[in-house]
Amino acid sequence: MSFDQFAPFMTLGRPDAVCDECSRPVAPNSISDDDAAVNTTETDTQHANIPEEQDVINIKLDSTFNAESSAETIDLKVEGVKLAIVSQQPTYEAITAETTSSVATSEEASSDTATSLTNLTSREPSPSSSSASSVAEECPSEEPASDDTVPAASEKNHPDGTLNPNYHDARADEVHPQHEVVQVQAPHLPPPQGVQPAATENPDHDSLFSVFTQDHNPLLSGTIVGAPADYVASTPGKKIRDKAASALNIWLQVSPDDLNQIRTVIDMLHNASLILDDVEDGSVSRRGRPATHMIFGMPQAINSAGYQINRAMMEVLKLGSQDCLEIFIEELDRLYIGQGYDLFWTFNIKRPSVEKYISMVDYKTGSLFNMLVRFMAAKTGAKGGVETDNNKAPIAPPDLTRLVVLLGRYFQIRDDYMNLTSDEYTLQKGFCDDLDEGKFSLTLVHALENSPEAEKSILRHLLTQRLSSNGQGMSLAQKHLVIDIVKGAGSLEYTVTALRKIGMEIVNELDQIEGVTGIENKELRRLVEVLRV
């Protein structure tokens, strides 16, 4: 325990000398004439700035700690004033100041000193003050007096005139009416190391830590975790799935509330997939703006995407359909599997077959289209079927599974093709951004299958060099070389032909569904026409 904090209350003078027997400070008039002469020379040199007439009071502090009561007793031994402080956190109390006859200064100086220590705060005298203040530490003499006789406690000085350490003035035990018990407010002092505090603590101390046990701490909103998803949702997009929902509802006739709820779920999942796709592909831009993780950081972007997926499932519960919850889980599982294959081929530079590539597209891109139409069909079934314009009797909802699978394939293959050839895509994502990512598009898969061996080798080396570019992807010259190779292999024409074939199948499906329902779907036909290459 440090007593430096009490220094302003205890610095009443300067020490002049110590006892040869016990090393205690002694008053000036207790010292022999010869010693006084020496001490006067030394102390005057060290304290030349202290006035000669200043009275000197010597202080000694002793501290003891009671582990059972968690109380600390501080004895202040002052030549002229005796003060005992008992600390029971956080108040130091039970103080009795008594003047003794061993004071080397004048009676007035002793009285002033006692007053300065006791008048911090006045209290009524305590019955226990006499016993608390009468504790005095005895100083045993290590050697007997020179005449082999130990002076009695009632004798003040040794025969040689020095102070007797065993001297005790009986008047010190008397309780004087002018002595008061004072309350000294002191800083909180922790118990010594290894000693546990008492079970009953100060109420203020308990309230300081009440935050750790209270039940009503502030609630945290989803604003921060949702900010990255809100950002990607604000970027301009094609809204293909949203438009498809409106077009398909011409046949399925889902209620406006349910349709809006389904759109919300699909949009949340789509935005989450865009965030994760940009992180996993290493894309730095999306729709002409910085990718989400380039603004919010990769950890926060990933966390926000996971949060959106969880929130989407909560929105599914609002549809009130167990079938919809099962659809959500099944199609989300397919989405993860498809993305896993895409990442595996990219990381290992392993070219898939065309058949496996199409299966990957059905899982990765087609899952959200399939989830959309399955949600709508589930909510249509709750109403008993679809009503036609000519016949109000409900009929079974049409099977749109093949139609949405073809839509998913067309959308993904077209998107990859446009990334290699479209000036609009170049402005939004950069020139041939998919080559920086190393993605195996249908065009690249065809080129690696049908190019001469020399060109195949060059393509494989370019994809390998991409991994050693410190995340910079391919250079502009490398990208132009890839385009030249795929053109030479006829891969761009092959991709356009595949898109036209898929487009024709979509139109055939439209014709069949319109024939079954008797409802022409002009809105869906316009959407297909907009996507035509």
Curated annotation (Swiss-Prot):
In the Enzyme Commission scheme, what number(s) does this protein have?
2.5.1.-, 2.5.1.1, 2.5.1.29, 2.5.1.10
Q: List where Low complexity composition bias occurs.
A: 98-138
As to how many cofactors bind and how, the note says: Binds 3 Mg(2+) ions per subunit.
Give me the residues that bind Mg(2+) 3, please: D415
Keywords of the record = Antibiotic biosynthesis, Isoprene biosynthesis, Magnesium, Metal-binding, Transferase
Biological process terms in GO annotation: alcohol biosynthetic process; antibiotic biosynthetic process; isoprenoid biosynthetic process; mycotoxin biosynthetic process
| Binding, dimethylallyl diphosphate | R286, K364, T365, Q412, N419, K429, K439
Q: Where is this region: Disordered?
A: 98-169, 187-206
Which parts of the chain span the membrane according to its record? none
**Pathway(s) of this molecule:** Antibiotic biosynthesis
Taxonomic lineage from the root = Eukaryota, Fungi, Dikarya, Ascomycota, Pezizomycotina
Q: What is this protein called?
A: Geranylgeranyl diphosphate synthase sdnC
User: Which coenzymes or cofactors are required?
Assistant: Mg(2+)
Has UniProt tagged this entry with the keyword Transferase? yes
Domain of life where this protein originates: Eukaryota
The family this protein is said to belong to = Belongs to the FPP/GGPP synthase family.
Listed binding positions for Mg(2+) 2 are D277, D281
A GO molecular function term, named singly, is: metal ion binding
- In this chain, isopentenyl diphosphate is annotated as bound at K238, R241, H270, R287
* Its biological purpose: Geranylgeranyl diphosphate synthase; part of the gene cluster that mediates the biosynthesis of sordarin and hypoxysordarin, glycoside antibiotics with a unique tetracyclic diterpene aglycone structure. First, the geranylgeranyl diphosphate synthase sdnC constructs GGDP from farnesyl diphosphate and isopentenyl diphosphate. The diterpene cyclase sdnA then catalyzes the cyclization of GGDP to afford cycloaraneosene.
Task: Tell me the enzyme class.
Answer: transferase
Binding residue positions for Mg(2+) 1: D277, D281
Catalytic reactions of this protein: isopentenyl diphosphate + dimethylallyl diphosphate = (2E)-geranyl diphosphate + diphosphate; isopentenyl diphosphate + (2E)-geranyl diphosphate = (2E,6E)-farnesyl diphosphate + diphosphate; isopentenyl diphosphate + (2E,6E)-farnesyl diphosphate = (2E,6E,10E)-geranylgeranyl diphosphate + diphosphate
